[in-house]
């Protein structure tokens, strides 16, 4: 066995090199790749042209400017606030509006520091080589997060207009700030461990350092507003509505966005994860008073149906994905068929997503919002006709609905990003359906909206939906289907996943 573990043999390499240099095609590819980027040489121009900005269904009805997270990992906050601003702009018929991302991120840093210090007190006797403690020490206050964290921050601290708390240099360029807060937290940890025999002394140290971090945040982000005035100009009538002495919470009430109705749903083909089951991410909490993050899993068809339901009902859809694959920034496209790496390097991109997740080839790292999709109407008419002909002699069930969703021929999706207007198509991006199935793993949906959609799914006619079986009078078809697709999953006892799970990775793209 040891003989097989030999060192790199220079002669073997020279022999291989000599063989390659005899191959004219290798010379051609080498000359091209040495002087150009891999992506520019491997790009498939025939495929990239089909990913244009034309969509059969697009809900983006506002003229709101694209947001820009700049050199920070605040994507999860930007995507959450972009969801609610779409509703706010439509409800108030205004030209543009933006919520302050820095306001929420200010308190995100403070809450993370508080949670970390409490964890360090709880683990004061744990050896620093412990796997959990090692993970916590590696990433105490980075920019990343999840939808639920944004949800909790908004409900606790409210929201303010961006005009009341603009991006500071440090909120838009967080690297140095994060390092400084990290140093403070590690200094606190040293003092806590030196005083571990006294519980009160440890908490006094915690409070001292938390106030010091609060001072750093005030110095670098600015002071969060407590009260403010707001004027909203109707873009049609030019009438101006004025609001005085708003607080972040009274302003939140005026938005009328039911955050408690929204839940995170995941589709993951990872073999160690059950479908239609709730999961809890250990140590994934941004506030001491909140528990760990919980998400629910569904199958691929249900996942697609939920995304369609939100968009058909004109609701922006927060989603999380892995943006590190098959991306063309100039065109603003993510698609599996953009590049032909296989011809150059014999790298086969198989569809064994379970292995990709297990071996950390893929993991969610960025959040954006879906704003629309494009499907082939003629192909859909054909698929429906064939399917209903095949099942005409029986009442249809929720499984038939999922089969039809599978047959619904989406070609591409419209995405609103938070990377500014200079990237993509003025800040908007395209993702192919194949890429969606490969790299989109989480969506955030409104339970009420899903039930509303299931009263008569928009992609089916009322006549065809009537073919689905009816239920007892005390339960509507919509409610019954909702429970089968999603509701029953919410009743399952959460299974806890460790901090080193592939799913316990913060979004900071």
Where are these regions (language model features)?
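Long, positively charged binding patches that form subdomain-scale interaction surfaces
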Residues: 292-365, 380
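Active-site nucleophile-adjacent alpha helix/oxyanion-hole segment immediately C-terminal to the catalytic cysteine
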Residues: 50-318, 376, 413, 423-425, ...
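Bimodal feature
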Residues: 5-28, 65-67, 78-81, 88, ...
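Conserved catalytic-core surface of thiol
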Residues: 371, 376, 382-388, 392-509
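Intrinsically disordered, low-complexity acidic Ser/Thr-rich regulatory segments
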Residues: 282-286, 352-359, 400-409
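N-terminal regions that are enriched for targeting/export leaders
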Residues: 4-64
């Amino acid at each position: 066995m040891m003989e097989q573990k030999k060192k790199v043999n220079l002669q073997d390499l020279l022999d291989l090199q000599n063989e390659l240099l005899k191959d004219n095609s290798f010379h051609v590819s080498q000359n091209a790749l040495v002087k150009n980027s891999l992506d520019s040489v491997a790009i498939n121009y025939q495929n990239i042209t089909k990913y244009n900005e034309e969509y059969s269904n697009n809900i983006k009805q506002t003229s709101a400017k694209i947001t820009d997270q700049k050199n920070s990992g605040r994507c999860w906050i930007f995507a959450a606030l972009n969801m609610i601003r779409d509703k706010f702009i439509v409800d108030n018929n205004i030209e543009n509006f933006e919520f302050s991302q820095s306001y929420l991120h200010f308190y995100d840093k403070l809450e993370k520091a508080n949670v970390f210090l409490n964890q360090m007190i709880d683990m004061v006797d744990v050896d620093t080589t412990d796997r959990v403690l090692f993970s916590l020490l590696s990433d105490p206050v980075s920019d990343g997060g999840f939808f639920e964290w944004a949800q909790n921050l908004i409900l606790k601290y409210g929201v303010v207009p961006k005009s009341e708390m603009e991006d500071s240099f440090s909120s838009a360029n967080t690297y140095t700030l994060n390092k400084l807060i990290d140093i403070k937290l590690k200094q606190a940890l040293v003092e806590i461990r030196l005083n571990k025999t006294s519980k009160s002394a440890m908490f006094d140290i915690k409070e001292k350092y938390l106030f010091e971090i609060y001072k750093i945040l005030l110095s670098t982000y600015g002071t969060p507003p407590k009260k403010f005035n707001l004027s909203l100009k109707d873009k049609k009538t030019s009438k101006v509505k004025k609001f005085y002495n708003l607080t972040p919470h009274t302003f939140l009430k005026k938005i009328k966005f039911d955050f408690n109705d929204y839940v995170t749903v995941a589709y993951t083909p990872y073999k160690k994860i059950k479908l239609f089951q709730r999961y809890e991410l250990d140590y994934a909490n941004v506030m001491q008073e909140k528990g760990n993050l919980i998400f629910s899993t569904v199958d691929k068809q249900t996942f697609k149906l939920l995304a369609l339901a939100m968009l058909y009902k004109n609701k922006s859809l927060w989603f999380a994905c892995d943006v590190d694959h098959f991306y063309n920034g100039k065109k603003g496209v993510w698609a599996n068929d953009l590049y032909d790496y296989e011809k150059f390097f014999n790298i086969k991109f198989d569809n064994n997503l379970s292995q990709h997740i297990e071996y950390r080839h893929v993991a969610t790292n960025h959040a954006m919002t879906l704003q629309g999709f494009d499907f082939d109407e003629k192909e859909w008419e054909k698929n429906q006709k064939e399917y209903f002909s095949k099942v005409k002699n029986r009442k249809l069930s929720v499984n038939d609905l999922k089969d039809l969703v599978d047959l619904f021929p989406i070609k591409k999706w419209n995405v609103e990003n938070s990377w500014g207007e200079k990237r993509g198509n003025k800040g908007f991006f395209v993702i192919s359906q194949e890429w969606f199935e490969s790299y989109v793993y989480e969506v955030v949906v409104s339970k009420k909206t899903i039930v509303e959609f299931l009263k008569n799914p928009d992609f089916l006619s009322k006549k065809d939906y009537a073919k689905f079986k009816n239920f007892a009078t005390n339960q509507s078809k919509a409610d019954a289907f909702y429970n089968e697709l999603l509701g029953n999953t919410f009743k399952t006892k959460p299974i806890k996943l460790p901090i080193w799970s592939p799913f316990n990775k913060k979004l900071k793209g």
